[in-house]
């Protein structure tokens, strides 16, 4: 649960002890990045997982009721795609469920496709649109089904089985697939227009 609460805290500027006017800490060695004037927290997209991990280790590492390393390993699993394989089965399950909750929570939002404009400009600020193949907000919607089926679906199936047990969980599944269906069918007014 704590990893759920902390996995995106790395977007917030000033949360790490050494964040200052010279920049924001982005790794355990104390490396920093200086953001351009006027940047939003979205500019930390490429560093937010590392920053979240550093925050968890620093703030929870001395509190006995928390296993800060376990929380940090679960947060690592929210990096998309996962870059470091979990070291044990328990972390694999916890981390994969956290990753699935993160993905389903975003992609199952009934307004997700309408948010493509804002998401595009967040990606633009972070400098990742080109590498993702996005030239406009409409590309996020056009490429969404391929992204979902190839990159997301294989990583959320266990969570979908759990969600299918409750009515509210089934609603999240329906929302998730509705967004994919609408993007596949090019339903107008679902997001950025061509």
Language-model segment annotations:
Residues 39-43, 88-91:
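Short, solvent-exposed segments of well-ordered alpha helices
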Residues 15-38:
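Post-HEXXH active-site segment of zinc metalloproteases
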Residues 6, 10-17, 61-65, 76-194:
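Divalent metal-dependent phosphate-bond-processing catalytic cores, especially two-metal-ion Mg2+/Mn2+ enzymes
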Residues 2-3:
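Active-site alpha-helix of zinc metalloproteases
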Residues 41-83:
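Histidine- and acidic-residue-rich, metal-dependent catalytic cores
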């Amino acid at each position: 649960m704590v990893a759920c609460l902390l996995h995106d805290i790395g977007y917030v500027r000033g949360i790490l002890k050494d964040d200052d006017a010279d920049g924001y800490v982005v790794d355990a060695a104390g490396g920093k990045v200086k953001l351009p004037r006027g940047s939003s927290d979205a500019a930390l997209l490429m560093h937010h997982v590392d920053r979240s991990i550093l925050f968890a280790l620093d703030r929870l590492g001395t509190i006995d009721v928390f296993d800060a390393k376990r929380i940090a390993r679960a947060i690592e699993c929210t990096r998309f795609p996962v870059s470091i394989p979990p070291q044990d089965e328990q972390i694999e399950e916890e981390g994969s469920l956290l990753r699935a909750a993160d993905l389903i929570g975003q992609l199952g939002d009934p307004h997700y496709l309408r948010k493509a404009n804002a998401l595009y400009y967040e990606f633009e600020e972070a400098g990742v649109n080109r590498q993702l193949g996005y030239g406009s907000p409409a590309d996020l919607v056009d490429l969404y089904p391929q992204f979902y089926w190839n990159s997301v679906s294989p990583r959320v199936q266990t969570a979908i089985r759990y969600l299918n047990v409750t009515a509210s969980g089934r609603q999240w599944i329906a929302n998730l697939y509705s967004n994919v269906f609408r993007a596949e069918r090019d339903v107008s007014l679902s997001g950025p227009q061509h």
